[in-house]
C-alpha cells in the first residue's frame, strides 16, 4: 500500500502526547513532538508492549511494560541500535494526520 491513510485528527493529539490507532489493519503509535507528528509500529520489539500508551518525553517514548525507550523520529532504541521499531511516513493535510504504511 502506498497511499496515506487517516490516523487521527491533529487537534486530538496535543504536543507531548501519543495515540494508538489502527491504520490499514496495523497498530500504529502516533506522536506529537512539539507540533511535528511521527508514527512508529505500535508494538515494542522487546515483548510487544503498546508504544502508543507509553510515556512520552520530548522525542522519546518509553514502553509502558518494561521501559524500553525509543526515539520516535528514527525508531531506534536509545540504548543501542540493535532493536529498532519500524517508522512510517507522516503528513498533515486539512488538520488530519495521515500515515503511509508500506
Q: Residue ranges of each PLM-predicted region?
A:
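N-terminal pre-ligand scaffold of iron-sulfur
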Residues: 1-58, 71-72, 76, 84-102
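Short cysteine clusters
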Residues: 44, 63-66
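Glycine/small-residue-rich loop that forms an oxyanion/phosphate-binding "nest" at active or ligand-binding sites
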Residues: 81
Amino acid at each position: 500500500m502506498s497511499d496515506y491513510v487517516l490516523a487521527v485528527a491533529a487537534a486530538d493529539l496535543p504536543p507531548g502526547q501519543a495515540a494508538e490507532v489502527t491504520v490499514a489493519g496495523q497498530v500504529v503509535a502516533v506522536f506529537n513532538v512539539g507540533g511535528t507528528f511521527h508514527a512508529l509500529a505500535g508494538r515494542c520489539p522487546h515483548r510487544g508492549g503498546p508504544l502508543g500508551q507509553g510515556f512520552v518525553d520530548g522525542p522519546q517514548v518509553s514502553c509502558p511494560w518494561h521501559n524500553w525507550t525509543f526515539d520516535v523520529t528514527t525508531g531506534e532504541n536509545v540504548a543501542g541500535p540493535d532493536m529498532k521499531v519500524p517508522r512510517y511516513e507522516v503528513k498533515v493535510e486539512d488538520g488530519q494526520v495521515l500515515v503511509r504504511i508500506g
